[in-house]
Swiss-Prot record:
Tissues and organs where the protein is expressed, per its UniProt entry: Expressed by the venom gland.
Family: Belongs to the short scorpion toxin superfamily. Potassium channel inhibitor family. Alpha-KTx 09 subfamily.
Name listed for the protein in its UniProt record: Peptide 2
Keywords for the protein's UniProt record, in alphabetical order: Ion channel impairing toxin, Neurotoxin, Potassium channel impairing toxin, Secreted, Toxin
Length: 28
């Protein structure tokens, strides 16, 4: 599928959540 940024994953944080195959990681 690949990876894409999901800005709605982390609220109230200046982060770029990267979602890969349903797994999201918040990069603060």
């Amino acid at each position: 599928v690949g990876c894409e940024e999901d800005p709605m994953h982390c609220k109230g944080k200046q982060a770029k959540p990267t979602c890969c195959n349903g797994v999201c990681n918040c990069n603060v």
